[in-house]
Design a protein with these regions (language model features):
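Core catalytic alpha/beta fold that binds nucleotide/phospho-ligands
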Residues: 1-157
Length: 157
C-alpha cells in the first residue's frame, strides 16, 4: 500500500493561516505542536507534518474503507526532516518526505522496503477508481495495482 501528498508552499502561505487561533490544536497533537514550536522553520514543520498525515491517511482509508477528517488520530513520529512514521489505531506507516523551495512531497508505505518499489506512472496510463480509490490494471496479469495520486496548486504526482 502507498499514499502520497504534495503541499504547494506558495499556495499554503497565501491560503492557509496556520498561526490563527486554535489551528494547531485542531490538527496536531501536543508532541507535534512542540516539534513545530521548536523547529528552525515552524512553517515548514507544519506542512511537513501535515503532508505526512495526509499520505498516511490515504493508506489507512484504502485499508479500512474509513473516510473522515480526524487529523489528531494520525500521530507523526519525527526522525528527521525526511523520515518518520505516522500511527493511527495500532497501525504504523513509514514516511519519506522531500522538501524543496516551493513544495513538500511525502510518500507513505506500510513496509519500509516498499520505498524501493515505488515507480512513477506514465501519464498515458489509464487510472481507474473503485470506491474513490485509484488503481491501474496490469496488461499482462490483469491484476489491479494500487496507485496514489496527489495534485495541489502547480504540482501533480
Amino acid at each position: 500500500m502507498i499514499g502520497n501528498d504534495i503541499v504547494d508552499l506558495v499556495l499554503a502561505k497565501k491560503e492557509s493561516n496556520w498561526k490563527r487561533n486554535r489551528f494547531l490544536d485542531k490538527i496536531f497533537t501536543i508532541k507535534e505542536q512542540v516539534l513545530i514550536v521548536d523547529a528552525e522553520n515552524p512553517e515548514i514543520m507544519v506542512w511537513n507534518l501535515w503532508s505526512r498525515k495526509e499520505a498516511a491517511y490515504k493508506i489507512y482509508n484504502r485499508e479500512t474503507g474509513i473516510r473522515g477528517y480526524f487529523p489528531l488520530q494520525l500521530e507523526c513520529f519525527y526522525e528527521n526532516a525526511t523520515l518518520g512514521t505516522v500511527s493511527i489505531k495500532g497501525k504504523t506507516y513509514f514516511t519519506q518526505s522531500k522538501i524543496e523551495n516551493d513544495s513538500i512531497c511525502t510518500i507513505a508505505v506500510v513496509e519500509k522496503e516498499y520505498f524501493k518499489k515505488i515507480k512513477s506512472i506514465n501519464p498515458a496510463v489509464k487510472i481507474l477508481k473503485k470506491n474513490g480509490i485509484p488503481f491501474t490494471i496490469d496488461c499482462n496479469s490483469k491484476m489491479e495495482n494500487p496507485v496514489s495520486i496527489s495534485h495541489l496548486g502547480g504540482f501533480c504526482e
